[in-house]
Amino acid sequence: MARTLEAFLNDERRRVVHLKDVLPPNASDVDWIGYVSREAGDWIVVTRDRRVLTRSAERVALQSARLRLLAMSAGLLKLQHHEQMARLIQQWPRVEAAMALVAPPAGYRLPPRWNGQLEQLAV
């Protein structure tokens, strides 16, 4: 997912980072959240892990890191990878617009439908 986003989004205003490129493969959610919070920039974290918002340690880490999170919906995760990426890229302008309107910590869920609305999440 990160490689596709990188090809689509990298420009002078944006940078896409795959966590596997900067952290060990066994890094925990709390580890990567801490890493991102220490890096400069206005991050939008894209994740397939819906549980990051339901486990208390990860939720506390997200709140203290003051990140913006985009979670893939369960319905979206059932689609083939290329369909997931097509929807993510198609919805990206909406994602950026929505994230610009909320103070971190904040989160949205990306729907599986082409015309689906982003669902704001409690972070």
Where are these regions (language model features)?
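Ser/Thr/Gly-rich flexible loops in soluble cytosolic domains mediating phosphotransfer, phosphorylation
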Residues: 65-99
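Acidic, metal-binding active-site segment of PIN/NYN-like and related structure-specific nucleases
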Residues: 29, 36, 40-61
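Short, aromatic/basic amphipathic alpha-helical patches
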Residues: 2-8, 56-64
